[in-house]
Design a protein with these regions (language model features):
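Hydrophobic core segments of alpha-helical transmembrane domains in multi-pass membrane transport
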Residues: 57, 61-62, 99-109, 145-155, ...
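Cytosolic-side transmembrane-helix boundaries in multi-pass membrane proteins
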Residues: 132-139, 209, 213-255
């Protein structure tokens, strides 16, 4: 997010006349490239996903500081058209809501109604079994990480557009927020289970929690503590539920 947002902001500041759509495509391309690299590392070099993602995250964060030379890109350096990507409206509806609805519809259909979507669930549940039945496991893994990189690039551009500021530490610490939202939304930490609708509901729930704590004058230090407890409880519940389902499935097979 930080790199795609920063590079796009630098491009916009140097070329104010550039189309906002091209700016969006630039950021998404950067995200797609980053996601593809992670996918290749995991699928073809068998690097653990958490190592590949966190490692490249730090590399890209460093690249963000390098390309920006440690400086910010501020609102006055950005064109009105670019800032309107997030803050503008279409038919009276905020553009961010429109982006969210389009993404939700596309990915809900893709993951639930297409053969590739079913393959993704299969690989998430058991990569080895999926490969035994003819699914190209490596291609599916590469596809998933590429698509997630594409969305991260889009999010980076929209973030910079909304806040009219690009900096090297954009979205630092949001990794845990994303994990919390997905787990609260019912996504299995071991893969193979989850719905786009659940992730949205989990994001809303986590957002309500994060915004409610300051309103009741909870200390920032306690806010982090409480959010951490919620994340941990959600993960434990997720794992216990999955184990219960696995035991139930084994009993059915035995019968």
């Amino acid at each position: 997010m930080a790199l795609s947002g920063m590079v796009t902001a630098l491009t916009v500041s140097a070329n104010p006349e550039i189309s906002p759509l091209l700016s969006l495509l630039e950021g998404m391309s950067i995200g797609l490239a980053a996601g593809s690299i992670i996918g290749v590392l995991i699928a073809y070099f068998n690097i653990l996903p958490i190592i590949a993602t966190l490692g490249l995250m730090n590399i890209l964060r460093g690249m963000t500081y390098l390309v920006s030379k440690g400086k910010w890109v501020s609102a006055y350096q950005m064109s009105t058209g670019f800032k309107n990507l997030s803050t503008g409206t279409t038919l009276g509806i905020n553009n961010l809501i429109i982006f969210a609805v389009i993404i939700y519809i596309f990915y809900s259909y893709f993951i639930n109604q297409t053969k590739t979507g079913r393959y993704i669930y299969a690989v998430g549940s058991s990569p080895e079994t999926a490969e035994l039945i003819g699914i190209k496991r490596r291609r599916i893994i590469l596809l998933v990480y590429s698509l997630m990189g594409l969305l991260a690039g889009l999010a980076g551009v929209l973030w910079v557009s909304k806040f009219a500021s690009a900096q090297g530490d954009t979205a630092v610490g949001y990794e845990m927020n994303v994990i919390a939202a997905t787990v609260l939304g019912g996504v299995s930490v071991s893969g193979g289970r989850g719905r786009v609708t659940g992730i949205i509901l989990g994001s809303i729930l986590f957002g309500i929690l994060a915004n409610a704590l300051p309103l009741i004058n909870i200390s920032p230090f306690w806010q982090q503590f409480i959010q951490g407890i919620v994340i941990l409880a959600a993960i434990i519940s997720n794992v216990l539920l999955q184990r219960r389902n696995e035991r139930a499935a084994l009993k059915k097979r035995a019968i």
